Amino acid sequence: LECYQMSKVVTCKPEEKFCYSDVFMPFRNHVYTSGCSSYCRDGTGEKCCTTDRCNGARGG
């Protein structure tokens, strides 16, 4: 499963590849944000982190 990193997506933790401040892409970028498993700090403030979805994930 291949994961895409968009401009607003930040990886704060190696094990949690999807950290974001406010991202939802209803386009082909395939960045899905369906909840936070944790939060992390990144200079600008807190980011929501999840491992739920990667590019190509089906449903939901």
UniProtKB/Swiss-Prot annotation:
GO terms for cellular component: extracellular region. The keyword Disulfide bond applies. Expressed by the venom gland. Belongs to the three-finger toxin family. Short-chain subfamily. Orphan group XX sub-subfamily. InterPro entries: Snake_toxin-like_sf, Toxin_cobra-type. It comes from Naja annulifera. Keywords: Disulfide bond, Secreted, Toxin. It is found in: Secreted. Its main location: secreted. This is Weak toxin CM-3. Disulfide bonds join C3-C19, C12-C36, C40-C48, C49-C54. GO terms for molecular function: toxin activity.
